[in-house]
Amino acid sequence: MDDVVLEVRHLSHRFKLTRKLAVQALDDLSFQVRRGEIFGLVGESGSGKSTVARCVMNLYQPTGGEIWFNGVNITDRSQRRKHKKMLETKRQLIFQDSGSSMNQRMKVVDVITEPMRIHHIQTPRKTPREEAAFQLKYVGLDGSYLDQYPAELSGGQRQRVNIARA
């Protein structure tokens, strides 16, 4: 069984600024992510990290190349329509701006356990709160953060909460 869940092949993206002026944000980028692998895209400001993420999440249509998710070419619009439900439920990305991706009215415990509740995921721990505490410990935060709101956390703490949620 092939364990590649995300494959980006020769991805390019160009932003058209005016009729005559365009900026090439991505040029011939290729990579694979395997099941269970934690993958990070690192680069300088303006290097295209967010553009890659937005292409993978179908927020931008690439100007070249292909993006394959679980064997489906998501750059092919007919394939996206055919597999819409699977594509909407199986991807999670953590952006650098981790604070804006969290519901600011939810406590950390709820931020972490919301995907488990939505997708009916069972864990070895007895309660969702115990699972959230376990996930926080895994990323180097203790259970005292469970009842805090995202606005009360530093940027690094919010990022770790997002990792715990994923």
How would you label these PLM feature ranges?
Residues 65-76:
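Conserved ABC transporter NBD signature motif
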Residues 126-144:
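Conserved ABC ATPase "signature" region
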Residues 57:
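Helix-to-loop junction immediately C-terminal to a conserved catalytic motif
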Residues 163:
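Hydrophobic anchor residue at the start of the ABC signature
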Residues 149-153, 157:
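Conserved ABC ATPase signature
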Residues 42-44:
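The feature captures the beta-strand-to-loop junction immediately N-terminal to the Walker
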Residues 19-20, 74-92, 110, 118, ...:
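ABC ATPase NBD coupling module
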